[in-house]
Amino acid sequence: DCSDAAMKHNMASEGGYNRRYRFLKNIMGMWMIQSVKKESGTTLSYAQICDKASHTSIDSTVDCYDERFLAPESMIDEIAKACEESGQQIPADLYETANVVYKSLAKCYASTIAEIEELTGEHYTCINIVGGGSNAEYLNRLTAQYTGRTVYAGPSEATAIGNLAVQMISSGEFANEAAVRRCIFDSYGVNKYE
């Protein structure tokens, strides 16, 4: 879609296998939580941070599209400032900060899906999350909650698996994309959130 409306919403078309194109919007994704983890110096895993964030009650969110989060001197401070400037609760620790990030991303996903549906005239009943974000159980639950859609999360190594899948189709191991997708779904522990 090369319309003015698509450009206004910062949408893109990404080329893929077999001359297919995906209409999409690049979202900050896990960059914010990676920055928070690194800056905090914690030795906890992303899964542990995600779990601990899910047990906090802060409801603050920030705009993940805001350029202030692209490369701030301190991601933790920038998130706190954004919360303060908007009159919301300021996160008090790593876990509240992570909760703000996860809730903000889920809200961002919901608004992006609404934009895509508006531009395409299509309604999507499910969301597929792949890559590292698919391991963030709390984020996936929030995404299902905020979007009202079923979320399928995984596989986490989607790029490598996708490259292998294309080679297997080309060599005749699979008849088509549908067959390889079914195999991936059955083989890699895709989790479902509703």
What is the meaning of each model-derived region?
Residues 132:
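Glycine-rich Rossmann-fold phosphate-binding loop(s) that bind the pyrophosphate
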